[in-house]
Design a protein with these regions (language model features):
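Short, surface-exposed loop or secondary-structure junction motifs
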Residues: 2-114
Length: 114
């Protein structure tokens, strides 16, 4: 079904792709991981429904969109964000984790009430 997934369907969460962050959060984010681990997880998940059939939030789609932007622009995603969004909007205190990795607050997570 990959040939049926479009940029638009990834943008509006109708691609059918799963969410690599969801149930794989603990496996992927205990330590820093590279693009290969994330791509392998997305590939292993496959699709949950045919593109256009449903709407479901997908970090996987947005991750793939960021990789596509990097390939087309030949620049890292964090640089593209700064040049095209945060810089133009004057958002001096908004940044990518790649710009300041030591200033990142750990997200909340479901740990079964513990």
């Amino acid at each position: 079904n990959a040939d049926k997934i479009t940029l638009e369907s990834m943008l509006n969460h109708t691609s059918g792709l799963g969410d690599y962050v969801g149930e794989h959060y603990h496996k992927l984010f205990k330590k820093p991981v590279g693009n290969k681990a994330i791509l392998d997880t997305i590939k292993a998940q496959g699709v949950e429904f045919l593109p256009g059939e449903k709407t479901r939030y997908s970090n996987s789609g947005y991750y793939l969109l960021s990789r596509i932007l990097e390939k087309v622009a030949k620049k890292p995603y964090n640089v593209l964000l700064k040049e095209n969004i945060t810089g133009k909007a004057g958002m001096k205190n908004t940044f990518s984790v790649l710009d300041h990795p030591t200033n990142v607050f750990k997200s909340y997570e479901n740990n079964g009430g513990n």
